[in-house]
């Protein structure tokens, strides 16, 4: 559900690939429904933001100053739409490269008449580095990222020490990094990374995972998993001064 991009870097790609940042995603083609195509055609000019070369003034983009959340890898956008609709006094930024997902979200924005949501359809790390000012986000959400199960692919996981450091620089003091996964080994891995990341406090009473926060909508995929006895692990970390 998190990100996507070009062909993954491999040694066979030549020497140039060795100097590229390893991506946590692979671009996959997908069929577009009529609604998704409509969303892209009508919603892109209104709600999709271009990569910038300097931090963006989102107060100007949204026409107000409000609490601001960013979700990396919103998939088909159901959760992000629900959160934005439920909190009209807050602003939301979604990042996703899967075109059908972007189209689905934009179609929902148009259908529901939402004005508090904007989208980037490119690499989330590029968005954080180039568009998001330091100390500006109230919350960053990473729900059900690709766990890259095989050990040789662990380097592709988005949650790394460098990611934790980058996110911390973008969060306000007291801002929250909220992650969720349905694969327990990945939850344990994320805890290992975050528990040694400087400048964070784990909000779980036991120092592990928090109960599912009410503000995170339950997806159809998650409900199906619950019926099958599958678990979901939520992690919340607060940025310290």
Curated annotation (Swiss-Prot):
- Protein name as annotated: tRNA (guanine-N(7)-)-methyltransferase
Name the UniProt key words of this record, in alphabetical order: Methyltransferase, S-adenosyl-L-methionine, Transferase, tRNA processing
The protein's matches in Gene3D superfamilies, at most eight in alphabetical order, are given as: Vaccinia Virus protein VP39
Q: What positions constitute the catalytic site? A: 146
Reaction catalysis annotation = guanosine(46) in tRNA + S-adenosyl-L-methionine = N(7)-methylguanosine(46) in tRNA + S-adenosyl-L-homocysteine
Give the protein's function.
Catalyzes the formation of N(7)-methylguanine at position 46 (m7G46) in tRNA.
Gene source species = Pseudomonas fluorescens (strain SBW25)
Q: Which GO terms describe its cellular component?
A: tRNA methyltransferase complex
């Amino acid at each position: 559900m998190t990100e996507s991009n070009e062909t993954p870097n491999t040694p066979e790609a030549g020497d140039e690939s060795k100097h590229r940042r390893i991506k946590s995603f692979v671009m996959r083609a997908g069929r577009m429904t009529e609604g998704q195509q409509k969303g892209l055609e009508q919603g892109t000019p209104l709600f999709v933001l271009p990569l910038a070369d300097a931090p963006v003034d989102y107060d100007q983009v949204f026409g107000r100053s409000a609490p601001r959340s960013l979700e990396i890898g919103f998939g088909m956008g159901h959760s992000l739409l629900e959160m934005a609709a439920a909190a009209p006094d807050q602003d939301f930024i979604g990042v996703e490269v899967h075109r059908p997902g972007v189209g689905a979200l934009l179609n929902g924005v148009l259908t529901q008449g939402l004005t508090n949501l904007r989208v980037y359809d490119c690499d989330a790390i590029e968005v954080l580095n180039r568009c998001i000012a330091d100390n500006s986000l109230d919350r960053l959400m990473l729900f059900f990222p690709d766990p890259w199960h095989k050990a040789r692919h662990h380097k592709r996981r988005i949650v790394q020490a460098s990611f934790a450091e980058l996110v911390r620089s973008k969060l306000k003091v007291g801002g929250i990094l909220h992650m969720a996964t349905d694969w327990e080994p990945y939850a344990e891995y994320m805890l290992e990374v975050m528990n040694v990341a400087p400048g964070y406090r784990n909000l779980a009473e036991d120092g592990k995972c928090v109960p599912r926060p009410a503000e995170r909508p339950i997806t159809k995929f998650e409900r199906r998993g619950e019926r099958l006895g599958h678990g979901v692990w939520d992690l919340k970390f607060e940025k310290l001064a």
